[in-house]
From Swiss-Prot:
Region (Disordered): 1-43, 99-224
Protein name as annotated: Histone H1.03
Protein family according to the UniProt entry: Belongs to the histone H1/H5 family.
UniProt organism field: Gallus gallus
Compositional bias ranges of the Low complexity kind: 1-22, 30-42
GO cellular component, one term: nucleus
Chain ranges of the H15 domain: 40-113
Length: 224
C-alpha cells in the first residue's frame, strides 16, 4: 500500500503541463485570422472615389449608378449597402466628394476641386526629388578639380629655387666690389712720401749762400 502512493503523485504533476500548452496555440490562430482579413481588397471609400472619378457626368454620379459601378467591379452591394452610405457621408465630410443633389447618402456625388488639385500636385512633388541627384553628380567633378589645384602648389617650390640661385650670384659678385674699394687706398699711400721729398730740397738752398759770404771776407785783407 505504501508503494502505490508515490506513483499517483507524478501523474498529478504531469496533468497541468498540457493545460499550459493549449493557451499558447490560441494566439497563433488569432494571428492567422488577422492575416486572412488583410487581403480583402481596397476599402469602400477607395472604391467609391474611383467610381466617381471614372464617371464623366457633369452633374455627378447618382447612388444607383454608383452601386452599378461597384457591382461591376465585383463588390457585393447588397451585403455592404450600409457601408456604402457611411463611406459616402465620410467622403463628403472630409471634402473629397461634393453632393450635387439630394441629402445624406441619397443623391448624386462628384469629386471636389481640392481633391483633383491634390492628385495633380502629387506627381509634381516627385520632380523635386530628382533635382538633388544633379548636385550629387557635380560633387565628383568638383573633387576631380581639386587635384589640379594641388599641381599648382607643386610649381611654387620651383619659383623658390630661382631666388636662391640669384642670392648665390649676388654673393659671388660682392667680393669684386671689395677689391675695387681697396685699390684707391694704395694710391693715397704712394702720394704722401712724394710730397715730403719735394719739401726737403727747398730747405737746403739757403745753405749754399753761406760760403759766398766767406769768400768776400777773405778778399778784404788783400787790399791792405
Amino acid at each position: 500500500m505504501a508503494e502505490t502512493a508515490p506513483v499517483a503523485a507524478p501523474d498529478v504533476a504531469a496533468a497541468p503541463t498540457p493545460a499550459k500548452a493549449a493557451p499558447a496555440k490560441k494566439p497563433k490562430k488569432a494571428a492567422g485570422g488577422a492575416k486572412a482579413r488583410k487581403p480583402a481588397g481596397p476599402s469602400v471609400t477607395e472604391l467609391i472615389t474611383k467610381a466617381v472619378s471614372a464617371s464623366k457626368e457633369r452633374k455627378g454620379l447618382s447612388l444607383a449608378a454608383l452601386k452599378k459601378a461597384l457591382a461591376a467591379g465585383g463588390y457585393d452591394v447588397e451585403k455592404s449597402n450600409s457601408r456604402i452610405k457611411l463611406g459616402l457621408k465620410s467622403l463628403v465630410s472630409k471634402g473629397t466628394l461634393v453632393q450635387t443633389k439630394g441629402t445624406g447618402a441619397s443623391g448624386s456625388f462628384r469629386l471636389s476641386k481640392k481633391s483633383g488639385d491634390v492628385k495633380e500636385k502629387a506627381p509634381k512633388k516627385k520632380t523635386p526629388a530628382a533635382k538633388p541627384k544633379k548636385p550629387a553628380a557635380k560633387k565628383p567633378a568638383a573633387a576631380a578639380k581639386k587635384p589640379k589645384k594641388a599641381v599648382a602648389v607643386k610649381k611654387s617650390p620651383k619659383k623658390a629655387k630661382k631666388p636662391a640661385a640669384a642670392a648665390t650670384k649676388k654673393a659671388a659678385k660682392s667680393p669684386k666690389k671689395v677689391t675695387k674699394a681697396a685699390k684707391p687706398k694704395k694710391a693715397v699711400a704712394v702720394k704722401s712720401p712724394a710730397k715730403a721729398k719735394a719739401v726737403k730740397p727747398k730747405a737746403a738752398k739757403p745753405k749754399a749762400t753761406k760760403p759766398k759770404a766767406a769768400k768776400a771776407k777773405k778778399a778784404a785783407p788783400k787790399k791792405k
